[in-house]
Amino acid sequence: MVMTDPIADLLTRIRNANMVRHEKLEVPASKIKREIAEILKREGFIRDVEYVEDSKQGIIRMFLKYGQNNERVITGLKRISKPGLRVYAKSNEVPRVLNGLGIAIISTSQGVLSDKEARAKQAGGEVLAYVW
């Protein structure tokens, strides 16, 4: 079966694993999923990311992060730009998530960036998701 929205699938897998407090999850690899996983690691939402090469497309293994009392670090994920309705932001209109407590993931001409990085590089683009 062909997947119509692999980014939404990635976010749903992270959300589901997080809700049942799994330590790790594996998703089929793609370039954009790899970049999103790196942003989540860099911003402190997940502990680590590994890339496993297999005979097909490869696997991204993500290790989720939890607080001292096993509380979730990721409290919410939301897909913004969808295949049926694309959402774009200009460089001066890059959204803030929960007044800076969360991040927006934006696909720009300079690669996939967090909202903070996009503001620093003055880059706009497609708003892929919010994570808080």
Curated annotation (Swiss-Prot):
UniProt cross-references to InterPro entries, sorted A to Z: Ribosomal_uS8, Ribosomal_uS8_CS, Ribosomal_uS8_sf
Classification via PANTHER family: 40S RIBOSOMAL PROTEIN S15A (PTHR11758)
Membership in a protein family: Belongs to the universal ribosomal protein uS8 family.
Function text: One of the primary rRNA binding proteins, it binds directly to 16S rRNA central domain where it helps coordinate assembly of the platform of the 30S subunit.
PROSITE patterns reported for this sequence: RIBOSOMAL_S8
Listed HAMAP family: Ribosomal_uS8_B (MF_01302_B)
Record-given protein name: Small ribosomal subunit protein uS8
Top-level taxonomy: Bacteria, Bacillati, Bacillota, Bacilli, Bacillales
Domain of life: Bacteria
